[in-house]
């Protein structure tokens, strides 16, 4: 029975940390924490990069300016080598995606109890209630562990894919790609259409689920470490955080890179 109680306690701890602060019901449920943190991190990106742009000097750059210039040059070189269209929107879009997703992913490195506990205290709950696991204040601080956020990002990319395909190839050219490829034979048009439609829909699905799955798994492991090891969690927590430092920028890069590739394919003229 003691083991069962322990499992329930750990299960409740995990469930609490993986539950979003929400308003509304059903389809119209809004995850307030995801929306708030994504907006805050977006503003951090915009304001910090804007501050660097305003203070940029031709002389020896400061550390933050050098960091920003390194990121901008890296993204610009990636776009130039991958995107073969003529749109001037792609490089700023790629930079926004990379930095914004990176900042959201970096929230995974904050100790799992820190911000939820602070939110519960601000909401008026006592430390005794929080320590007993009876807090009713929920907060997920990593927006990319919310599948709604990753789907929203991928749907934006999907909309741009359709936009560039129709803009460059025309609606007729876009539809012809769906039914006349890969087999340009009239009696196989129906098969082509199904095949290409599945392939088209799979792109935003895989884009969103890849980011969500990797970050959700990482957050779950952090929570398991915190919930099962107590005071002994710190060494393992830091070891996992060190490993996760590779995953966090890698997933941001993959999301950006696939976005560029998809938009490049959409912009090709046939």
From Swiss-Prot:
GO function terms (MF aspect): proton-transporting ATP synthase activity, rotational mechanism
Domain of life per record: Bacteria
Topology of the protein relative to the lipid bilayer: Multi-pass membrane protein
Transmembrane segments: 27-47, 90-110, 147-166, 182-202, 211-231, 238-258
Cellular location(s): Cell inner membrane
CDD domains in the cross-refs: ATP-synt_Fo_a_6 (cd00310)
Gene Ontology biological process terms from the UniProt entry: proton motive force-driven plasma membrane ATP synthesis
Main subcellular location of this protein, as a coarse class: membrane
Keyword terms, alphabetized: ATP synthesis, Cell inner membrane, Cell membrane, CF(0), Hydrogen ion transport, Ion transport, Membrane, Transmembrane, Transmembrane helix, Transport
Pfam family, one: ATP-synt_A
InterPro entries given in the database record: ATP_syn_F0_a_bact/chloroplast, ATP_synth_F0_asu, ATP_synth_F0_asu_AS, F0_ATP_A_sf
GO terms under cellular component: plasma membrane; proton-transporting ATP synthase complex
Main function: Key component of the proton channel; it plays a direct role in the translocation of protons across the membrane.
Subunit structure: F-type ATPases have 2 components, CF(1) - the catalytic core - and CF(0) - the membrane proton channel. CF(1) has five subunits: alpha(3), beta(3), gamma(1), delta(1), epsilon(1). CF(0) has three main subunits: a(1), b(2) and c(9-12). The alpha and beta chains form an alternating ring which encloses part of the gamma chain. CF(1) is attached to CF(0) by a central stalk formed by the gamma and epsilon chains, while a peripheral stalk is formed by the delta and b chains.
PANTHER family noted in UniProt: ATP SYNTHASE SUBUNIT A, CHLOROPLASTIC (PTHR42823:SF3)
Protein family according to the UniProt entry: Belongs to the ATPase A chain family.
Name of protein: ATP synthase subunit a
Lineage: Bacteria, Pseudomonadati, Pseudomonadota, Gammaproteobacteria, Alteromonadales
């Amino acid at each position: 029975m003691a083991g069962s109680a322990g499992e329930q306690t750990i299960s409740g701890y995990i469930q609490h940390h993986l539950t979003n602060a929400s308003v509304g019901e059903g389809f119209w449920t809004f995850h307030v924490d995801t929306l708030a943190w994504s907006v805050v991190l977006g503003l951090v990106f915009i304001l910090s990069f804007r501050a660097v742009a305003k203070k940029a000097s031709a002389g020896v750059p400061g550390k933050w300016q050098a960091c920003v210039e390194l990121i901008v040059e890296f993204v610009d070189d990636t776009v130039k080598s991958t995107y073969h269209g003529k749109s001037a929107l792609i490089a700023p879009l790629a930079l926004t995606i990379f930095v914004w997703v990176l900042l959201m992913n970096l929230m995974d490195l904050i100790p799992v109890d820190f911000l939820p506990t602070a939110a519960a205290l601000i909401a008026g709950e006592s430390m005794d209630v929080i320590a007993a696991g009876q807090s009713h204040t929920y907060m997920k601080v990593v927006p990319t562990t919310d599948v709604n956020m990753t789907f929203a990002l991928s749907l934006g990319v999907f909309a741009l894919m359709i936009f560039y395909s129709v803009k460059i190839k025309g609606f007729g050219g876009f539809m012809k790609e769906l039914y006349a490829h890969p087999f340009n034979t009239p009696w196989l048009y129906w098969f082509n259409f199904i095949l290409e439609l599945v392939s088209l829909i799979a792109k935003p699905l895989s884009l969103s689920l890849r980011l969500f799955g990797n970050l959700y798994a990482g957050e779950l492991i952090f929570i398991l470490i915190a919930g099962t090891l107590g005071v002994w969690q710190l060494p393992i927590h830091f070891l996992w955080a060190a490993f996760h430092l590779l995953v966090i920028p890698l997933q941001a890069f993959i999301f950006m890179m696939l976005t560029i590739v998809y938009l490049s394919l959409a912009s090709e003229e046939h």
